[in-house]
């Protein structure tokens, strides 16, 4: 497996890793993903005094070179993070048990009073926080990727790339340039 590459199965979830309800309106399940190896990518944007922020998170099947993106709606964020991963690994504490800590401190919550409540999936969630709280602001594990989300909480644009009725790419956009936003509004008919 190449660096920053993950293996996805046919069932994938696009969600803020804090959400324990996989069937909630705030995330998106994709049940027709082309199984295989996916390259992961984040695009960063220099946001002045805010520093470098992640503008988008993308997974793309390794055989696809020129995706055509289709807007399929949006996904919600409440913890300032977004994950794209196999349904089998989402909030799976058994998967998290073997994941290394990536920050120097290890568990970012320690005994802190705001530590997430002890519930199923908390071990996985804390390991995802470990990936987004480091300088890179994102990270992968065998069957998923997680990143911080631009300026944090909100609703973000979700796009897929399809071929032969199978999804072979997912992109979540957190930040857009002013020009991209104007082009989008023009396409939606907000300008004459």
Segments from the language model and where they lie:
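Intrinsically disordered, low-complexity acidic regions enriched in Pro/Ser/Thr
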Residues: 1-192
């Amino acid at each position: 497996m190449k660096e920053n590459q993950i293996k996805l199965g046919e069932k994938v979830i696009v969600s803020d890793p804090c959400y324990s309800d996989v069937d909630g309106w705030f995330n998106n399940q994709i049940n027709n993903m082309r199984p295989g190896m996916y390259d992961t990518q984040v695009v960063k944007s220099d946001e002045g005094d805010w520093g470098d922020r992640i503008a988008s998170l993308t997974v793309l099947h390794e055989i696809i070179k020129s995706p055509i993106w289709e807007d399929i709606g949006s996904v919600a964020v409440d913890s300032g993070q977004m994950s794209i991963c196999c349904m089998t690994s989402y909030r799976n504490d058994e998967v998290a048990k073997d994941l290394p800590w990536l920050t120097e401190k290890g568990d970012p919550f320690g005994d802190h009073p705001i530590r997430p409540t002890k519930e199923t999936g908390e071990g996985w969630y804390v390991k995802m926080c470990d990936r987004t709280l480091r300088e890179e602001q994102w990270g992968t594990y065998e069957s998923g990727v997680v990143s911080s989300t631009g300026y944090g909480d909100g609703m973000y644009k979700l796009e897929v790339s399809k071929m032969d009725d199978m999804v072979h790419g997912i992109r979540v956009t957190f930040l857009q340039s002013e020009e991209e936003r104007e082009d989008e509004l023009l396409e939606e008919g907000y300008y004459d």
